[in-house]
């Protein structure tokens, strides 16, 4: 049996039917890590010994009825900004190189209760600030489809691990597209849920009003099943929502007849790569052939989305990252004169360039002379963007957009021009500004064989519309193929 061809749900079903053991799946994943990790570098840390022990424990639990869920026994990787008790959590930053949390994030407790097996921690852009996983203090992650290209970011390690077969499932976090964009680059499926659906307790904060944890998987059904496990109210997170509609899997059918899709015309203007546009338009054609209605409309606030997002996100980041000062935990500069000098040198040496850039931008827009001109204006703009999305959802079930204007850039290209990297988030940031759910599904490849993803955006609490549409499209599209199949490009 080729375990690499199985989805997470299929693997769990084979385990339940006693065709394979939990340990078989875990061993398979570690075999893939051993074979590919030197090239891909998706992980910052792996827990082989603990995972093998956990596999035996879960196997016993499945047999005695303790673990009955649809993903029991499945290996999963965790982005390294999500706390696991007793395991280093670095956020891919030098300043947290030795930070070991004394508690689990809420999502970790839920995964363990559901019988999943945690494989390790994945690489990311430092403090989730970046779109390429190149700002990590611990080296770049490479795209499994072509090792000369980036996997996207900031959840690039999680998406690359799934694409390379180094895990079946992964958790990422999404602040401005950090699950959806790397999912597109790596040819996997990823969803950013409605804000407040998944507890942020134990997620190291970047921008608290925008951050949300979400699943990455091989297909839509895997992501729906994983979201059912991690979603739900948590009293430890003041922004956590009480929701009754957390059965996502039942919404998935092969039919989308009568669904109305909206496409913002501004999302197809200059800057969109022709090959990405062609794949996107072909997807619209497929949806129409399936009986859906696709209409174009104007989203006038599009040009304000990037500036509003980067002002708000950087402002919140500058506040959140004040806690990393070398006093209680993490890196501390070795040589300093007095307390203030220790703060200064610790943060100068501990933070990377991109993080410092965003802290400075955030501090600037929050400063007394510029607060009204920038931060307050950005908040008002955010409200106008949300109003326009509300108007769109009064007419459309789902909005469609490319996940990124281009396919995965070559390593090093994006770091030369940070502004261009920021502009690459044009199609994803509004989802976070408005607290909406969004899913990325592979829809094509460019001439070089790099994946292209389509993004489906839903109204708040309407993930079921996304799962229905994405699953139906996925069935029509057929098999997308696998990265590193028959040897990788290098």
Show where each model-derived region lies.
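Conserved acidic residues
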Residues: 41, 168, 397-399
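Residue-level signal for inorganic ion chemistry
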Residues: 29, 51, 104, 223, ...
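Short glycine/serine-rich loop/turn segments
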Residues: 72-213, 264-266, 315, 401-419
